[in-house]
Amino acid sequence: MERRKVTIRYFLESKGKRRIAMITAYDYPTARLVDEAGVDGILVGDSLGMVVLGYESTIPVTLTDMLIHVAAVARAKPKALLVADMPFMTYETGPRDALKNASKLIRAGAEAVKPEGGLEIVRIVERLTKAGIPVMGHIGLNPQRVLTLGGFRMMGRTEEQRRKILEDAKALEEAGAFALVIEFVPAGLAREVTESVKIPTICIGAGPYCDGQILVLHDVIGLSEKPPSFAKRYADVASIIRNAVSNYVNEVKESKFPSPEYYKE
């Protein structure tokens, strides 16, 4: 039986009832495959800067980059909910710019957008949600702030950080966010956040107590050069690709390819 389209309502109704599984995808073929695998949500993440484009952080990723990849994923017509990251400096400059840029992502095929931050972006989230653009929040570690943080560090270890993250969660919920990604915080804190809000929480590197989980596809399938410590590798696709291409190269060098079944005289 063909599965139904996953909606914002599905996410909201999942709170405390069923686990939500999300993963990233950045192009048509992988979007099709992960959707066939049954994920509930696909995130076109600005992580594409690191795992696809070769940058050392997500900061160089532009809105143009995101629009190209969102459109590619949308062409797969996934049953999963399609969420798009808002890249660095496409929303921090104010609600007006955020609305303009978020609307471009929606027109490209996204069904929700995800800016990073808490209290400091509440006005932006309010503006987007009032305009009818669904927003998934992102608290804890904000990779777009790696320069300020001095690296990708676990957040929420100090009492001040803990209070801030709890306040961020409530503020984003009140601003209209339909879900929250909680990244790289202690599991106990993620549990506190999950129990303090009525919207679903999605953990990445934050333990088992959220309403769902998300990982970067390239980490899951073994394509990442330096996966984070919290990412589980479920396959070694890098070896499969390397071996396949090596076999192809060898057959070309040895004049074994193309063999008769692959051409006509």
Swiss-Prot record:
Its main location: cytoplasm. It is an enzyme of class 2 (transferase). GO terms for molecular function: 3-methyl-2-oxobutanoate hydroxymethyltransferase activity; magnesium ion binding. Mg(2+) binds at D46, D85, E116. One of its GO terms (biological process) is pantothenate biosynthetic process. It is found in: Cytoplasm. Its cofactor is Mg(2+). 3-methyl-2-oxobutanoate binds at D46, S47, D85, K114. Its EC number is 2.1.2.11. One of its GO terms (cellular component) is cytoplasm. It catalyses: 3-methyl-2-oxobutanoate + (6R)-5,10-methylene-5,6,7,8-tetrahydrofolate + H2O = 2-dehydropantoate + (6S)-5,6,7,8-tetrahydrofolate. Pfam families: Pantoate_transf. PANTHER family: 3-METHYL-2-OXOBUTANOATE HYDROXYMETHYLTRANSFERASE (PTHR20881:SF0). Belongs to the PanB family. Catalyzes the reversible reaction in which hydroxymethyl group from 5,10-methylenetetrahydrofolate is transferred onto alpha-ketoisovalerate to form ketopantoate. NCBIfam families: panB, PRK00311.1. Homodecamer; pentamer of dimers. This is 3-methyl-2-oxobutanoate hydroxymethyltransferase. The lineage of its organism: Archaea, Thermoproteota, Thermoprotei, Thermoproteales, Thermoproteaceae. The gene is panB.
